[in-house]
Amino acid sequence: MDRRIFGLENEYGVTCTFRGQRRLSPDEVARYLFRRVVSWGRSSNVFLRNGARLYLDVGSHPEYATPECDSVRELIVHDKAGERILEGLLADAERRLHEEGIAGDVYLFKNNTDSAGNSYGCHENYLVGRHGEFSRLADVLIPFLVTRQLICGAGKVLATPRGAVYCVSQRAEHIWEGVSSATTRSRPIINTRDEPHADAEKYRRLHVIVGDSNMSETTMLLKVGATDLVLRMIEAGTTLRDMTLENPIRAIREVSHDMTGQKKVRLANGREMSALEIQEEYFTKARDFAEKRGLRTGAVDRILDLWERTLTAVNTGDLDLISREIDWVIKYQLIERYRAKNNLAMSAPRVAQLDLAYHDISRNRGLYYLLEKRGMVERTATDLEIFQAKSVPPQTTRARLRGEFIKRAQEQRRDFTVDWVHLKLNDQAQRTVLCKDPFRSVDERVEKLISSM
């Protein structure tokens, strides 16, 4: 697929520290966070003017789903806009708490595990054609996704019976199946529930739930960009070596526990390969594919360059090559500097605190944003683009229609209902427009509906 629709959903961890007598449960904190949303949207599940969806997920986790984007860079801008929107709700909730005499600070973490060992996710969505064989797509993708953490993990200090260790991925410990239609009960690598949010005869939505949530824009670029290239190869029928894993679930944990990428995992055919070798195989094929197909645009070149440098860095152990660009390395080096300075063991509570503070989305407190302010991390988006994306939808996808419809309906104080495919005015006529094509950003039916308000 030359032009693909992408979407990211991030669930955020909520916590609150209190200095007074009154303590609030995560549920109550989440209600404070969403009070402003509920006051104008009459629900804790709303679509916004930028085409995105914001809602309170199971277990009081706020979740932000980006609008449909047709470029990886735009996807990153909109994912970051989601962080900024939630940061705004955070400030609001703290102000409300203080007005009610409750002394406390609310924290939102863009990570994947809390201190109680619960996991919440970052789900990636890729639109794929209906014609291909979905099971083949999944088979070829699983070895890629199991080892992909090496290039885009968020890193985690994991407590084990033998002491604390630094792992590459946060999500790896919480994945229990390869392919499944459930997301919460059994966490698979690829979720097969068939909800394309588009013309079901033409499209399917590939729902990848194995990835970590990323703070780094460049890590996000590599995560989604490399996956898109692998998908394009599979769609084009490129022959790839059979790297089916004997036990993907065991492999995903083994890969996460090995920062060198050298440890061998068993393949279904009895051979053994390291995570690094598996990634190098996909990378080489993707680079040759991009070359042959004339796909070497600036954006693709940047993805391939970062992919290659990351594999070189892991292979040689020279992590400085990617110390400004890949989350798990940025965080690892931050922790190592701190440990050396304070003579701390990996298991020290202050190290665990640092691990968590990296993911704090508050730009005044979060460690990732402290590094960003100091110019210590690379960017792909600008602050202005992110600010605009808080209220302006992508202009080249269906999100534009949804965003314009919501904006007009709110301005005219009209009662309306929207989801990913429907736009409905709740008046006598109950007029509804069904938008099945996610690539269409212009539709006279929607324009008619908007101008009738």
Swiss-Prot record:
The species this protein was found in: Catenulispora acidiphila (strain DSM 44928 / JCM 14897 / NBRC 102108 / NRRL B-24433 / ID139908)
Reactions that this protein is recorded to catalyse: ATP + [prokaryotic ubiquitin-like protein]-L-glutamate + [protein]-L-lysine = ADP + phosphate + N(6)-([prokaryotic ubiquitin-like protein]-gamma-L-glutamyl)-[protein]-L-lysine
Annotated HAMAP family: Pup_ligase (MF_02111)
Enzyme Commission designation: 6.3.1.19
Record-stated family: Belongs to the Pup ligase/Pup deamidase family. Pup-conjugating enzyme subfamily.
InterPro entries: Pup_ligase, Pup_ligase/deamidase
Active site: 57 (proton acceptor)
Known pathway: Protein degradation; proteasomal Pup-dependent pathway; Protein modification; protein pupylation
PANTHER family named in the record: PUP DEAMIDASE/DEPUPYLASE, PUP--PROTEIN LIGASE
GO biological process: modification-dependent protein catabolic process; proteasomal protein catabolic process; protein pupylation
Note from the entry: The reaction mechanism probably proceeds via the activation of Pup by phosphorylation of its C-terminal glutamate, which is then subject to nucleophilic attack by the substrate lysine, resulting in an isopeptide bond and the release of phosphate as a good leaving group.
UniProt-recorded name of the protein: Pup--protein ligase
Source organism phylogeny: Bacteria, Bacillati, Actinomycetota, Actinomycetes, Catenulisporales
Binding site residues for ATP: 53, 66, 420
Keyword annotations from UniProtKB, A to Z: ATP-binding, Ligase, Magnesium, Metal-binding, Nucleotide-binding, Ubl conjugation pathway
Biological role stated in the UniProt entry: Catalyzes the covalent attachment of the prokaryotic ubiquitin-like protein modifier Pup to the proteasomal substrate proteins, thereby targeting them for proteasomal degradation. This tagging system is termed pupylation. The ligation reaction involves the side-chain carboxylate of the C-terminal glutamate of Pup and the side-chain amino group of a substrate lysine.
Encoding gene per record: pafA
Chain residues that bind Mg(2+): 9, 55, 63
Molecular-function GO term, any one: ATP binding
